[in-house]
Structures are given as structure tokens and as C-alpha cells.
């Protein structure tokens, strides 16, 4: 499988034979499994304080008082400690001892990454994620892109390559999150846009970090979650020419 190489002005400058990884079978089931495992392994154990709701001297009055036999505070009739009482303990709360991580076979994980990489070269799968682009896929750029250190320079490249519309899609798609996540540091939901993969960070990481929805990663740290956000493969990806060599050696 061949692909065109473009420079940072968006002009074609040659062709490259892509690694065999781009011919991998599309396996959405494995990709989903790998992404969910990665997300699960980031979770922290959580649970209430061991004595939450039980820090009280409440005792039951016992039978013979014409009221239920729930524990009651010493200075009154109000129930305490039990789950149905105000301020009482939770019934069946989450426990820190629960194992939240998930295991995945190493061969499955690698095959999922290979499959997600191959999906970035299929226009129908990329378009199904909602990405906006013009031109052929995959997008391979000469190694000079790795030395771009200014966001304005990266913006000019994305406009020349016909990818800027996707960045604007991500910018305009930023919405206030539904639910309590709003007050837990996750107020906005940000759509994912372009993924830039390079062999080394010679400045491109700094240039890309302030563009909405754009992510940067070196080829040696590429994973299934970056290639398939939300378990959906086909992320619009820009590959630097040297990164393909690293990818071929790694996978």
C-alpha cells in the first residue's frame, strides 16, 4: 500500500510504501476491548470512610414504646446510623477493595493497535467518526513537521492540508457536560479532532497543545485509546514520515 508524502506547505513531494500494519484486518471488537481496558486501568479505588454515618451514640429504645426499634439519638427521638435514617450509613457502598482494573492479552492489545492504525487509512471509517477532511488518506508529512514549534505555523499547515475544518468542528462542538461532572472538574465535553504522530517531539507537541481537540503523541507511546477515542476507530491522523519507521519496528 502506497501513500503520498506532503510537505508543510501541503504540496505532494513523493510517495512512500506504507508498513504492512496498514493492511491489518479491521477488528472493532478488539479495539473496543483494548480501549476499555486502558480506561479501567486508570481508575482509582474509592469508597466512603469506614465509620461514615456511624459516628453517633444512638441506641435502640427496644420494644414497648410504640415506635420502631431503630437506633435513636440520646437527646431526642430522631433515628440515626441506619441506612434509612438521615445522615445514616450508606447501604452496600462502593468498597476500595474492589478490583477495578481489567486485563487484556498482550497479543490482543497489539493487534488492536495495529487494527486501529489501519483504520486511519480508510476514508469511510474516518468519515463515520464525523471528521472533516479533503484529500487522500493516510496523511503522511515529511519529517520537518516535527520541528514546528509555533501554533500559527501548525495552523497554516493544517489549512494547506485541508484539515483545519476538523479543528473548527471540535472547537464549535465544545458543550457543557450533562450531569454532576460539571462540578467535578469536567465541566465541558470536548470533541476529539486530529491526532499528530511523530517520531520525536522537536517542538510539535508545544505547537499542537493549544488547538481544540488536537492530540500529539510519539510513535513509541501510541495506544488504542488515542487512535479510537470512545472506542470508535478511524481518528483523523497525521503521520510524520520518520514515525512510520518507528511504528514498523515497534509493532
Curated annotation (Swiss-Prot):
Against PROSITE patterns, the record matches this protein to: RIBOSOMAL_L1E (PS00939)
Write out the entry's keywords from A to Z. Answer: Ribonucleoprotein, Ribosomal protein, RNA-binding, rRNA-binding
Task: Please name the GO terms of the biological process aspect recorded for this protein, alphabetically.
Answer: translation
Its cellular-component GO annotations read: ribonucleoprotein complex; ribosome
Pfam families named among the record's database cross-references: Ribosomal_L4 (PF00573)
Q: Which GO molecular function terms does the record list? A: rRNA binding; structural constituent of ribosome
Matches recorded under PANTHER family: 60S RIBOSOMAL PROTEIN L4
What HAMAP family does the database record attribute to this sequence?
Ribosomal_uL4_A (MF_01328_A)
Please describe what this protein does.
One of the primary rRNA binding proteins, this protein initially binds near the 5'-end of the 23S rRNA. It is important during the early stages of 50S assembly. It makes multiple contacts with different domains of the 23S rRNA in the assembled 50S subunit and ribosome. Forms part of the polypeptide exit tunnel.
What family is reported?
A: Belongs to the universal ribosomal protein uL4 family.
Subunit (UniProt):
Part of the 50S ribosomal subunit.
Query: What name appears for this protein in its UniProt entry?
Result: Large ribosomal subunit protein uL4
Q: Which organism is it from?
A: Methanothrix thermoacetophila (strain DSM 6194 / JCM 14653 / NBRC 101360 / PT) (Methanosaeta thermophila)
